[in-house]
Amino acid sequence: MARKRRLTGEAALNAAYGKSDHAPLLEAWGVDLPDDLLRLALTHRSFANENGHLPNNERLEFLGDAVLGLAVAEQLYRQFPERAESDISKMRSGVVNMYALADVARRLGMGDYILLGRGEMLTGGKDKHSILADSVESMLGAIYLHHGFEVARATVLRLFAEKITEAPTTGLTMDWKTVLLEKLSDMKLPLPTYEVRGEGPEHDKTFYATVTIEDLVTHGEGHTKKVAEHAAAKQAVQKLNERA
């Protein structure tokens, strides 16, 4: 008997997308989307590349990232009128970082719907922070294209309401050392090493921290060792995000 031929291209995409009932997902998001746009929002580059370099959801992610950032920034501006710009910026980081987005994605059950390549599936891609976070942004991009900014904004405020309310705490005290450890675990990289030195008189010391992860070296400074280490860890996370 001849072996069944593996589907590729649009046929593979339609077959994979058709395996799921997307009504529960759209209900969780509280919106409707046409199949072609929803299918694109759920198509990870690993699936697209394995099936003839199909279009993937990265352009929608780009759009959704902008929508999310503006919606959250405006809400923080209105909800916390007494806060300085520097505080609002940190608060926004606490709401829209990869781990916060991944948390929202898990709550919505996104992992069960993302179309992944075989390699990503085998390495637990449907529960990776980065993939889940990207899927939230691509969905927001799709919602914006189909419904406009007001619906997209309302969706953001509904899904992120708790995180926005908690932003004065989570955003201003973000544990960058923990975030870095989670990032390294996702990327299968070794643990970081920290070196800290202090300069200046005892009553007014400045601490300088260095984080090393293989060939990546980042630096931070502050008036305590903890602040310096967290500043260096934050720089490391940002550099790793650029590489991802």
From Swiss-Prot:
InterPro entries: dsRBD_dom, RNase_III, RNase_III_dom, RNase_III_sf. It catalyses: Endonucleolytic cleavage to 5'-phosphomonoester. One of its GO terms (molecular function) is ribonuclease III activity. Its EC number is 3.1.26.3. Signal peptide: none annotated. GO terms for cellular component: cytoplasm. Pfam families: dsrm, Ribonucleas_3_3. It comes from the Bacteria. Its cofactor is Mg(2+). The keyword DNA-binding does not apply. Residues 175-242 form the DRBM domain. One of its GO terms (biological process) is rRNA processing. The keyword tRNA processing applies. Keywords: Cytoplasm, Endonuclease, Hydrolase, Magnesium, Metal-binding, mRNA processing, Nuclease, RNA-binding, rRNA processing, rRNA-binding, tRNA processing. The active site is at residues 65, 137. Residues 21-148 form the RNase III domain. Mg(2+) binds at residues 61, 134, 137. It is found in: Cytoplasm. Homodimer. HAMAP family: RNase_III. Belongs to the ribonuclease III family. Digests double-stranded RNA. Involved in the processing of primary rRNA transcript to yield the immediate precursors to the large and small rRNAs (23S and 16S). Processes some mRNAs, and tRNAs when they are encoded in the rRNA operon. Processes pre-crRNA and tracrRNA of type II CRISPR loci if present in the organism. This is Ribonuclease 3. The gene is rnc.
